[in-house]
Amino acid sequence: MIGISVTVITEIVGLVVGLVSGYFGGAIDSVIMRVVDFIQILPQMPIIIVLTTVIPNYNAVTLVFLIAMFGWTVTARYFRSFVLSQRGRDYVLASKTSGSSNFKIMFREVLPNITSMIIIDVVLSIAGNIGIETSLSFLNYGLPSTTPSLGTLIGFANDPVNVINRPWLWLPATILLLVISLSINYVGQALQRAGDARQREN
């Protein structure tokens, strides 16, 4: 659920930012991209680890927002590139000529034309966010130890007592994590190939 929740937030924020940046271009695009560049050069994992130790009443919701705080930038840059390729198309120019507002053009004209790219990014992002949550939980900086997750189970198996007495404990969670991640990635890559083929046809 953490991976899905983070993906929902990053997709919504990244999509809106990418639409605005790619559609308007110019100074607006430059300012937004400089903010995105700054956030992307920050060390994500160390900052999240530090914040988890200083934030009071830390819980799963806090973890979701901490991961999403960095993840939206990748999504924004991804969608911006597609919007830049769409804003000069005939249907966009026709909408501007007819007097449609920028908001209407972005969300009623441009957005439907990048739907396939949104689906692909959602699928691939889920796998990545699951990996981030698992890594943090394994290091005891993710979900609280009382919250069940693949990361906490693998981290629990790493306890010295369990390593000696139950060395197999990490295996089920690790196998399940690999199966989930590989399955999601295969689906995402298949969708990406289908989307690329459709774009070439157009």
What are these model-predicted stretches?
Residues 14, 18, 99, 112-114, ...:
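Conserved G/P- and acidic residue-centered "switch" motifs that form tight phosphate/ATP-binding loops
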Residues 52-55, 83, 124, 132-176:
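Glycine-rich helix-loop "coupling/hinge" segments at transmembrane-helix boundaries
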Residues 19, 49-53, 67, 77, ...:
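Transmembrane alpha-helix boundary and packing residues in multipass membrane permease domains
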Residues 9-13, 22-86, 117-119:
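Generic hydrophobic transmembrane alpha-helix motif, especially the helices
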Residues 52-55, 59-60, 64-70, 116, ...:
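C-terminal transmembrane helix and the adjacent membrane-cytosol boundary/short C-terminal tail
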